[in-house]
């Protein structure tokens, strides 16, 4: 589907997860993706902000340039075992357009030369090599409002090998320095190498040349061996490299102090939300798995903040786990070890590349970058971050200067008869004695005052803080593989201990720990309090959707009497008369697409399912889901975002940023949150809204501009605020049509998000590049409150 001003460039942007190999160096700083051959539109001149990574990770630069500046790509590809391994894909989009616009004729693409990476055009559906059904035509489609007849065409597509093209190269020029939060930082500007692109005026051919630096062109063979290795083994702890006793037990962030009084803006969005995208360099990791940081948003200008490293490590760990799990499910016979083996293997992969933090370092007190309320799905994550090193034992300890054992952390997850409540006091049962829930039938025995028990006892006199991690039942994930989350509860002091006879008739040790005052409260405690009360404090609307979503979305205001702004709620995109979605060709998978090697929808995603257990595996250029004519059931693994909201969300009044969005339950990393829905506009319509564009979301590139307007008609996505350290990212998804210039904007979780934490994504505004209707530069302060906040929204 296209509109009346389509251009030849539409034939070039045939991106998806595998149809067009694309680098994650084209992923934006908010996690979204920009096709290497066409960017999201932004009319204003763009500057660059660089975020540096470790040497083996390369650097990430926000590719924010003016349309006249061109780009150069570094390409990494793979040598396949045989010709059949190369999957040649093509777009299957049927589009409608008004006569009079230029339409590119389809030329056959003969070959792909890895030396110059010239990209040509290929024939349409014939190159797929899979059996697809023709889409049903809508005979009840309303007539076009245009006086001219509609014409259906099949856009040309691009054929490339299946693997990703890697790397976008840009140069930085230091232009000066500035003071920010008491620090002196360098201000740089992107100087992009030139990249040639030619478009024939007669509309017959469209070819793009990509220059490649020879030293960055890497050909790698894909191994097919057993990547999991022998039977599972218990992961051994690393020997201590250094131990640290902190002088300060609790590190508290300074409160946010707005520098000016805010007016009644509904949400922080003002001017255009732009989903500019930058991809990140991938490095070879193992025979089948490579680590990338998946288009992760930068958390600081230098990329070396402790908080950023924690988030990066967790994102890499979960991406690796999901890939291993997908490979394991594809095996004809499952091997012993199950989920524990997978997380151990993922942990070993990260450690082999130096992506673990403090796991060999013993720390007393606060672990850098870890905040109270952080949630984890696996205990192995605690090991990677150095929060709690043992993969199974409940007590972690070390030797102090005098050679005495002291406790550093405990995990209270229900294995023993611990007293868990909402107070700041924890009664913890010691370890040993076969008291816990064991698979074997060993008889219980008295616990001994040794190792971890002795360390907790010594911590009474030492008065050293002990980290407490609580295990909380998790009901968010679709499967029951993960039974609980692990939540960092903060620092406690051990006050006393005693012996008592347990229910099994043997002696056990009990330890009383008290939470150190001044730390943030765990959000699940607040959720539990609200569930107990009959009426919700501050509730001003029980359902802003008026029943249009599968779950009600309430509005809460505990600050004043203001009500949510009036608007018409729509759960789906609204297309104008000149743009009519035509369903894509379908797959014939009647039992779901999880194990079908010949599924047309999986082929369009590069032969890999983009989701696992209802969560996205990694950030992709474009995700194709099964369409309305596919024969698979609604429960198909390829239908995640099209079924609407599945997480309990609410809007709430913030102190300084209008209305925001949060969840009443834990959100696992990779979970679908919601769509950014509204009315589709042409760019010329959007330009007329200057000064009234708080809810505009730009689509397409600078030559094919489209915009979603959620001002009058929209969904909960219109309330999601900006953050310089976001926990969501925007992912392009297609399912009801295949016009890649008008994708659905779907928000997915970048991290494990605890309850009541505000949801946010990066608007990607440019400082001093936003103007009012008179051409004057507009300035707006940022109140996101993150440690990496730049201080200005634009």
Swiss-Prot record:
Pre-SET domain location: 585-644
* Keyword Transferase belongs to the record: yes
Listed under catalytic activity are: N(6)-methyl-L-lysyl(9)-[histone H3] + S-adenosyl-L-methionine = N(6),N(6)-dimethyl-L-lysyl(9)-[histone H3] + S-adenosyl-L-homocysteine + H(+); L-lysyl(9)-[histone H3] + S-adenosyl-L-methionine = N(6)-methyl-L-lysyl(9)-[histone H3] + S-adenosyl-L-homocysteine + H(+)
Record field: compositional bias (Polar residues): 194-203
Query: Which keywords does UniProt give here?
Result: Centromere, Chromatin regulator, Chromosome, Methyltransferase, Nucleus, S-adenosyl-L-methionine, Transferase
Report which superkingdom the organism of origin falls in: Eukaryota
Alphabetical list of InterPro entries matching this protein: H3-K9-MeTrfase_plant, H3K9_HMTase_SUVAR3-9, Post-SET_dom, Pre-SET_dom, PUA-like_sf, SET_dom, SET_dom_sf, SRA-YDG_sf
Domain Post-SET intervals: 778-794
Report the residue ranges that make up the SET domain in this protein.
647-764
* Renumbered residue ranges of the record's region Disordered: 187-210, 254-276
What molecular functions are annotated in GO for this chain? Answer: histone H3K9me2 methyltransferase activity; histone methyltransferase activity; zinc ion binding
Recorded GO CC terms: chromosome, centromeric region; nucleus
According to UniProt, the tissues expressing it are described as: Expressed in leaves stems and flowers.
Q: Which residues form the signal peptide?
A: none
Q: Name one GO biological process term.
A: regulatory ncRNA-mediated heterochromatin formation
> Any idea where the YDG domain is?
365-515
EC numbers: 2.1.1.-, 2.1.1.367
Query: What coarse category fits the chief subcellular location reported for this protein?
Result: nucleus
Relay the domain remarks.
Although the SET domain contains the active site of enzymatic activity, both pre-SET and post-SET domains are required for methyltransferase activity.
Q: What function is annotated for this protein?
A: Histone methyltransferase. Methylates 'Lys-9' of histone H3. H3 'Lys-9' methylation represents a specific tag for epigenetic transcriptional repression.
Task: Extract the PANTHER family matched here.
Answer: HISTONE-LYSINE N-METHYLTRANSFERASE SETMAR, HISTONE-LYSINE N-METHYLTRANSFERASE, H3 LYSINE-9 SPECIFIC SUVH5
The family this protein is said to belong to: Belongs to the class V-like SAM-binding methyltransferase superfamily. Histone-lysine methyltransferase family. Suvar3-9 subfamily.
Report what the protein is called. Histone-lysine N-methyltransferase, H3 lysine-9 specific SUVH5
């Amino acid at each position: 589907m296209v509109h009346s001003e389509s251009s030849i460039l539409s034939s070039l942007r045939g991106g998806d997860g595998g149809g067009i190999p694309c680098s994650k160096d084209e992923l934006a700083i908010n996690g979204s993706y920009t096709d290497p051959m066409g960017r999201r539109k932004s009319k204003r001149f763009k500057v660059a902000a660089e975020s540096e990574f470790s040497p083996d990770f390369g650097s990430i630069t926000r590719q924010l340039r003016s349309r006249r500046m061109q780009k150069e790509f570094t390409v990494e590809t793979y040598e396949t075992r045989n010709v059949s391994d190369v999957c040649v894909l093509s777009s299957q989009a049927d589009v409608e357009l008004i006569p009079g616009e230029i339409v590119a004729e389809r030329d056959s693409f003969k070959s792909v030369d890895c030396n110059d990476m010239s990209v040509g055009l290929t024939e349409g559906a014939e190159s797929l090599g899979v059996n697809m059904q023709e889409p049903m035509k809508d005979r009840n489609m309303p007539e076009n409002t245009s006086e001219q007849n509609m014409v259906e065409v099949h856009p040309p597509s691009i054929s490339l090998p299946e693997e990703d093209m890697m790397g976008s190269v840009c140069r930085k020029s230091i232009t000066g320095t500035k003071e920010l939060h008491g620090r002196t930082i360098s201000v740089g500007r992107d100087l992009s190498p030139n990249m040639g692109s030619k478009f024939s005026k007669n509309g017959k051919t469209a070819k793009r040349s990509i220059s490649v630096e020879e030293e960055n062109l890497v050909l790698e063979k894909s191994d097919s061996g057993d990547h999991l290795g022998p039977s599972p083994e218990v992961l051994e702890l690393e020997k201590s490299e250094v131990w640290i006793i902190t002088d300060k037990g609790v590190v508290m962030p300074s409160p946010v102090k707005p520098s000016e009084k805010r007016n009644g803006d509904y949400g922080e969005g003002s001017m255009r939300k732009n989903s500019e995208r930058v991809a990140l360099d991938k490095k070879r990791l193992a025979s089948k798995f490579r680590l990338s940081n998946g288009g992760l948003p930068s958390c600081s200008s230098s990329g070396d903040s402790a908080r950023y490293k924690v988030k990066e490590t967790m994102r890499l760990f979960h991406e690796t786990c999901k890939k291993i799990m997908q490979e394991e499910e594809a095996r004809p016979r499952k091997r012993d070890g199950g989920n524990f083996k997978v997380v151990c293997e993922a942990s070993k992969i990260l450690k082999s590349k130096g992506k673990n933090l403090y796991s060999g370092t013993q720390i007393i007190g606060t672990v850098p970058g870890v905040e109270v309320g952080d949630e984890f799905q696996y205990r192995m994550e605690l090991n990677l971050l150095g929060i709690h090193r043992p993969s199974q034992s409940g007590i972690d300890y070390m030797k102090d200067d005098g050679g005495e054992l002291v406790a550093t952390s405990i995990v209270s997850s229900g294995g023993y008869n611990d007293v868990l409540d909402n107070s700041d006091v924890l009664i913890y049962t010691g370890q040993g004695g076969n008291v816990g829930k064991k698979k074997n039938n060993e008889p219980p025995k008295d616990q001994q005052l040794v190792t971890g028990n002795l360390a907790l006892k010594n911590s009474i006199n030492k008065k050293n803080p002990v980290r407490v991690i609580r295990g909380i039942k998790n009901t968010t994930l679709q499967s029951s593989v993960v039974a609980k989350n692990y939540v960092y509860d903060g620092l406690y002091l051990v006050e006393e201990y005693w012996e008592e006879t347990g229910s099994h008739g043997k002696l056990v040790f009990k330890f009383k720990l008290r939470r150190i005052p001044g730390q943030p409260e765990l959000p699940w405690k607040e959720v539990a309090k609200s569930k107990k009360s009959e009426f919700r404090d501050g509730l001003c609307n029980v359902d802003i959707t008026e029943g249009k979503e599968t779950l009600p979305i309430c509005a809460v205001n505990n600050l004043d009497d203001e009500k949510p702004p009036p608007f018409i709620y729509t759960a789906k995109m609204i297309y104008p008369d000149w743009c009519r979605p035509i369903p894509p060709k379908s797959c014939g998978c009647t039992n779901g697409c999880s194990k079908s090697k010949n599924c047309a929808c999986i082929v369009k995603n590069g032969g890999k399912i983009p989701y696992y257990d209802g969560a996205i595996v990694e950030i992709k250029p474009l995700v194709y889901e099964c369409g309305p004519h596919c024969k698979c059931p609604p429960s198909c693994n390829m239908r995640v975002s099209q079924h609407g909201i599945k997480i309990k969300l609410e809007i709430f009044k913030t102190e300084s940023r209008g209305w925001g969005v949060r969840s009443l339950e834990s959100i696992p990393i990779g979970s679908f949150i919601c769509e950014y829905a509204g009315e589709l506009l042409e760019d010329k319509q959007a330009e007329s809204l200057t000064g009234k564009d708080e809810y505009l979301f730009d689509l397409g590139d600078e030559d094919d501009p489209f915009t979603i307007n959620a001002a009058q008609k929209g969904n909960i996505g219109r309330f999601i605020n900006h953050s310089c350290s976001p926990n969501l990212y925007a992912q392009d998804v297609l399912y009801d049509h295949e016009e890649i210039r008008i994708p659905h904007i779907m928000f997915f979780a970048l991290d494990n998000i605890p309850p009541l934490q505000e949801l946010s994504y990066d608007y990607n505004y440019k400082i001093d590049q936003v103007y009012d209707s008179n051409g004057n530069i507009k300035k707006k302060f940022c109140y996101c409150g993150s440690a990496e906040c730049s201080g200005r929204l634009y």
